[in-house]
């Protein structure tokens, strides 16, 4: 048999370590990563690169390639934005309010 004795105490729930603002930013950027590149692809395909035949290939191939490059650029901009926001948040948490010196 086991020598362990139950104390009858329930385990304490872990304290909330995830800040709501961090979770909000993560969800926001995840949604942006899902929506913006797809929207960029179809909007540039239909409005910006419509009928682009400057590359020497059939116009459909050129416009889809340019639209895909536009979507990749949009996704990378969102990713860079997330990294910038994360670094700013980290720097702000490190430079919190300084403790006041007590004068006696």
From Swiss-Prot:
<keyword id="KW-1133">Transmembrane helix</keyword>
<dbReference type="GO" id="GO:0070072">
    <property type="term" value="P:vacuolar proton-transporting V-type ATPase complex assembly"/>
</dbReference>
<dbReference type="Pfam" id="PF09446">
    <property type="entry name" value="VMA21"/>
</dbReference>
<feature type="transmembrane region" description="Helical">
    <location>
        <begin position="22"/>
        <end position="42"/>
    </location>
</feature>
<dbReference type="GO" id="GO:0012507">
    <property type="term" value="C:ER to Golgi transport vesicle membrane"/>
</dbReference>
<keyword id="KW-0812">Transmembrane</keyword>
<keyword id="KW-0472">Membrane</keyword>
<feature type="topological domain" description="Cytoplasmic">
    <location>
        <begin position="1"/>
        <end position="21"/>
    </location>
</feature>
<keyword id="KW-0968">Cytoplasmic vesicle</keyword>
<keyword id="KW-0256">Endoplasmic reticulum</keyword>
<comment type="similarity">
    <text>Belongs to the VMA21 family.</text>
</comment>
<feature type="topological domain" description="Cytoplasmic">
    <location>
        <begin position="87"/>
        <end position="104"/>
    </location>
</feature>
<dbReference type="GO" id="GO:0005789">
    <property type="term" value="C:endoplasmic reticulum membrane"/>
</dbReference>
<feature type="short sequence motif" description="Prevents secretion from ER">
    <location>
        <begin position="101"/>
        <end position="104"/>
    </location>
</feature>
<protein>
    <recommendedName>
        <fullName>Vacuolar ATPase assembly integral membrane protein VMA21</fullName>
    </recommendedName>
</protein>
<dbReference type="GO" id="GO:0033116">
    <property type="term" value="C:endoplasmic reticulum-Golgi intermediate compartment membrane"/>
</dbReference>
<feature type="topological domain" description="Lumenal">
    <location>
        <begin position="43"/>
        <end position="65"/>
    </location>
</feature>
<dbReference type="InterPro" id="IPR019013">
    <property type="entry name" value="Vma21"/>
</dbReference>
<comment type="function">
    <text>Required for the assembly of the V0 complex of the vacuolar ATPase (V-ATPase) in the endoplasmic reticulum.</text>
</comment>
<feature type="transmembrane region" description="Helical">
    <location>
        <begin position="66"/>
        <end position="86"/>
    </location>
</feature>
